[in-house]
Structure formats: structure tokens, C-alpha cells
A protein has these predicted regions:
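Bacterial N-terminal signal peptides
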Residues: 1-7
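Flexible, solvent-exposed loop/hinge segments and secondary-structure transition points
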Residues: 11-131, 138-142, 146-161
Length: 161
């Protein structure tokens, strides 16, 4: 019982702060954040990707040259998971778990799993590839996949507006 409690406590936590993520993406010189409002068709498209309403009316992002960074949240089983996504030239360069609040599914933070998303692009309303799951972390895998799709969609949206 103590081992189970210790492993669930180990899973929760801040793995990287928003600031540290942005500093890493933009070589310690992140640009000012920009915002998009989720209204009308955009909101409906976001809801279609996530299969539920997004929890906010505004989404912040950071853009410098061809690189865009997104810090987004999605529910795992019960609690939100905070992800950082770096996109360059319409492809995911990196996706990270910044903060994990669940008791299961934390394995999605490992580089071996995240590597599947490197180079991924948007094909219609989905990723251009299948993502292998992790036994016992299905909902966290779905959350990360949804955020990957959402960030690519939003990246395309801000480039075309």
C-alpha cells in the first residue's frame, strides 16, 4: 500500500515551468504572448478536435519566426494535464508534460513515448500518424494526442488569419 501511494505521489508534480519551457523553445528570449479568442467557427472546430468544449475563451501562444509554442491543458481521467508544444514549419518539434496532476498515466512524459509526435503534422482534423498507447495510461495518451492535434490546428489557424 505504501509503494502504491509513493508511486502515485511521484507521478504528480510540475516537471517544467511554463517559463522554462518557453526559454528552452526560444533560446532564453521568448517573445510576448499573443491571444486568440475561441468564438464562432473556431470554437466549434476546437470542440470537434477535443470532443468537448475547451475550458477557456482565450488561448495564449508565443510566436517567433517560424516557431510557435503552445501551453495547453487537457483532462486526463479527472485532473488537467498541462502540455507544452513546440511547432516549427507546421510540424511538432517537441511535446512535453509540464504539469501532471493525475495518479496514473504519467508515463506519457518520457522521451521514448513523446518521440512518436516528433515531425507530426495535421491531416484534416487528425494527426498524420497513429500513436501507440501505454498500458494503464490510455486517458493520458488520448489527452496528449488531442493536445498535439489542437496545437497543430491552432498553429495553422494563426498562420492563416
Amino acid at each position: 500500500m505504501i509503494i502504491l501511494l509513493a508511486s502515485s505521489l511521484h507521478a504528480r508534480g510540475v516537471y517544467q515551468t511554463d517559463k522554462d519551457f518557453l526559454d528552452e523553445v526560444f533560446d532564453n528570449a521568448p517573445p510576448k504572448s499573443k491571444k486568440i479568442m475561441l468564438v464562432g467557427k473556431l470554437r466549434k472546430s476546437v470542440e470537434k478536435i477535443l470532443e468537448h468544449p475547451y475550458g477557456s475563451l482565450r488561448i495564449r501562444y508565443w510566436k517567433k519566426d517560424e516557431t510557435t509554442a503552445w501551453i495547453l491543458e487537457e483532462i486526463g481521467k479527472v485532473e488537467p494535464i498541462t502540455f507544452g508544444v513546440e511547432i516549427k514549419d507546421n510540424q511538432i518539434q517537441d511535446i512535453r508534460v509540464l504539469e501532471f496532476r493525475e495518479i496514473r498515466g504519467w508515463e506519457v512524459r518520457y522521451p521514448a513515448f513523446r518521440k512518436q509526435f516528433e515531425g507530426a503534422s495535421f491531416d484534416g482534423m487528425k494527426l498524420d500518424r497513429e500513436v501507440d498507447g501505454i498500458s494503464g495510461a490510455t486517458l493520458s495518451v488520448w489527452a496528449m494526442t488531442s493536445i498535439a492535434e489542437l496545437s497543430l490546428f491552432l498553429d495553422e489557424y494563426v498562420k492563416n488569419k
